[in-house]
Each structure stands twice: as structure tokens, then as C-alpha cells.
Amino acid sequence: NMTNHSYFNLNGHKSGSVLHHRMQLLSDAFTPADAQSIPTGEVCSVDGTPMDFRSTKELGAEIDAAYEPLILGNGYDHNWVLKNEGRFDKVAEVTGDESGIVMEVWTDRPGVQVYTANFLENEAGRNGAVYQKRDAVCLETQNYPDAVHQKNFPEAICKKGETYDTKTAYRFHIE
């Protein structure tokens, strides 16, 4: 499952927590994982849960809710099921609360893993920065994790002789 793991803080270098960043995801469902972060095989609706980012809200609005998937992940570290049906389309938008920098995520992949840097602790950065828990967010476009073991997940195997071709773009502007 090829993806990337770029960390973003749209308020800028050394600006601390991303919990006030605002995010919208074009997704009605997510794939919960167990305590070892392995998907359970379920596809669950985001409706009425802290996983619902169909309308823009702050990353920190419900990140510490007493909701099992968030407790197991120590925050957001989940795959959302995208509605793009394999088309290259805008699937997410994140806005820095202080900077007004907007990052749009476009992809043809069926999923996006959102990770809120739940396990960063005293991570050395450039120019003397020290990154802490939730100082960044990752939006990792991908196939569903563990798809090879989950019969109800979309096929994710690239067979000999086949070409793997995918496109993801991160577009930035100021609001």
C-alpha cells in the first residue's frame, strides 16, 4: 500500500498544536482498527460520531472524545473511505487557524489516512524545533490498509505485468 507520510502544520514551523486547524473530508465512512492499528474489516458510517468531518470542524473539536476508535488510536489515525470513485478529485481541505493557509488534497485513491501525530514526543526538528504530540497532521492518500486480508475492501494488489499508476496533489492557497 504505497502512500506518503508528510507532516503538515499550516501555521508554520515551530507553531505548536494543529488542534485548531479546520478540516473537511469528503467521506461518509471510515475503517476502524484494533488496538494494534490493524483494520477490523468493518466500514462504519461517520454519521453522529467524532469521525464526521463532512462539515468543516477543528481537528481538536472531538479528538479526545470517549469514542473507542479515538481511544485506541490515541487520537485520529484512521482511514476514511473517499467518495471519489477512483476519479482524481478534491477529497479534503485543511486550513491553518492562524495563517489562513489552505491545503487541498486531491487524489484518485479510495482512502485517506488522517494522522494527528499522536505519538510525537520531543522529536528534533530543523532550526532547534522540538515537535510534540499533535503538532502536525498527515493526510495519506492510499488504498485501504490491510486490504489483502479484508475481503470487503477494494482490491489492492498490483500483479506482475501490471502498472501501478496513481495521482495525488496537495494544493495550497490563502483564504
Would you name each region that the model predicts?
Residues 1-175:
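An exposed, glycine/acidic-rich loop-and-rim segment of catalytic or binding clefts
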